[in-house]
Amino acid sequence: GGIRTALINYIIIQQSKKQNSKSKFLLRIEDTDKKRSNDQFKKNILEGLQWLNINHDDSIVIQSERLKRHQEIAHELLKNHGAFKCICSQSILEKKREYNKKNKISIKRLCEICEENNEVQLLTEGFVVRIKITNSQETTIEDIVQGKVTVKNEEIDNFILLRKDGSPTYMLSVVVDDFDMGVNLIIRG
C-alpha cells in the first residue's frame, strides 16, 4: 500500500457512503511476513493517516493476530482436497523451473501433488501447504479497471498457503481476511 492508495480508497469510500451508508474504510495491518514487518511500519501507517485526518471506520485488523483463523481455512482446504502437502525443497523446485524453461513448458506449476507417496518425509522433514489448482479450467474475475479477466488455470502456480512452520502466507491471509471483513472493493498499491 502507501499513502496514495489510502487516499484513493478513502475518497472512493466517502463517495460511496453518499449512496450507500454500509460502505466502510477499513484498516488492516498485513504483517504475516515477519522478515518485512515491524512495529515501526505500523506506527508510520497510523501516523500518516492521522496527519491526513483519515479515520478508519472499524477496529484495526492485525493479520498476525488471526493466525488460528488462517490455519483453520488451510486445514479445511486440505480436508476438502482444495490444497495439498508439499515436501519439495528449493533445489528441487529450481530444477523443475530449469526443466520447464528448457523444454518450453508453459505450466507454471512446479510442484505436483506429492503427499500420497511420501508420508515418512512429511513427518520427518515437514511440509508446506499449497493450493490445488486443476488444469482443466479457467478462472475469471471482474476487474473495475480491466473488465473481465480470464486466465487458464495451467498458468496459475500452486502457491503456498502455510509455510513449514505453520504460519500463513500473504496469499492465504489476505483472502480469508477480505472474506471475513466483507470486503467487496479492493484497491492495492
Regions found by a protein language model. Give the residues of each.
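Active-site cores that bind ATP or allylic diphosphates and position pyrophosphate for catalysis
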Residues: 63, 79-189
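N-terminal Rossmann-like or analogous alpha/beta NTP/dinucleotide-binding catalytic cores
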Residues: 1-102
